[in-house]
Regions:
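Generic recognition of flexible, low-complexity loop/linker segments
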Residues: 48-51, 79, 94, 114-115, ...
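Active-site-proximal loop/turn and secondary-structure-junction residues that shape catalytic pockets
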Residues: 15-21, 66-68, 96-98, 109-111, ...
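Substrate-binding cleft of carbohydrate-active enzyme catalytic domains
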Residues: 1-86, 90
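C-terminal intrinsically disordered extensions
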Residues: 80-89, 94-100, 110-111, 120
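Flexible, acidic glycine-rich loops studded with aromatic residues
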Residues: 100-103, 109-201
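Structural preference for beta-strand elements that scaffold enzyme active sites
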Residues: 8-12, 57-61, 89-91, 102-106, ...
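A generic structural signal for short, solvent-exposed coil/turn residues
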Residues: 3, 54, 84, 97, ...
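Small-side-chain structural scaffolding
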Residues: 2-4, 17, 21, 90-92, ...
């Protein structure tokens, strides 16, 4: 974190809650959204906040996507409350479990992003619906990102916070050193950064 901070880069940790968390079930023998699971989760989060100061990580991504739980609103309220009690701002995937007002949405579905109207979207948001490097051929990414309209708006605003380019290492490679080029990271990053820095249609 200190290394990134010295170079003007903010780290936004993501702790997936409760989606993509099979490791939690295997380790503790219960689901994260169960009563016992939430008690364990609270201890883990408090340790995280104790170890990493607010000034180093003012945001915490709480995940929330691709999962169904018995009480989605209650679970989200539980997570958001702990995050806010430690003076952090929660971020959650959209679509995902229903967030509270004030939680930043990270949009990952093109069908939502393409229809996005920042006047009617109920919260601040981050554009990632065009930013999945593993979602198309690396040869196509450069033109896709360069022609993309960031946040579906001509300029930034209080709601449109920018974009995050996502590198999920889903492309199988025989050598870990090939992950970046096989996912189109170098050329994709250049086009994505240019569009989000300049903005406009």
């Amino acid at each position: 974190i200190a290394y990134a901070k010295e170079r003007g880069v903010m780290i936004i940790p993501e702790i997936d809650m409760p989606g993509h968390s099979q490791y939690f079930n295997r380790t503790f023998g219960c689901g994260m959204a169960s009563q016992k699971g939430m008690e364990i989760l609270e201890v883990c989060l408090k340790e995280f906040f104790k170890e990493i100061p607010q000034q180093d990580c003012p945001y915490l991504h709480i995940g929330s996507d691709e999962v169904k739980v018995e009480d989605p609103k209650g679970f989200m309220s539980f997570c958001e409350k702990i995050v806010r009690e430690h003076n952090r701002i929660p971020i959650a995937w959209d679509p995902g479990l229903p967030p509270a007002e004030g939680t930043i949405g990270q949009i990952w579905y093109a069908s939502i992003g393409d229809k996005l109207d920042q006047q009617s979207y109920p919260r601040r948001y981050i554009d990632s619906y065009m930013g999945y490097l593993n979602n198309s051929c690396p040869m196509v990414n450069t033109s896709r990102y360069f022609l993309h309209n960031p946040c579906n708006t001509e300029s930034s605003s209080d709601n449109a916070l920018g974009g995050i380019l996502c590198l999920w290492n889903d492309v199988n490679v025989d050598d870990q050193n090939k992950l970046l080029p096989h996912n189109g990271m170098p050329e994709g990053l250049l086009a994505f950064a240019e569009r989000f820095w300049v903005g406009g249609n």
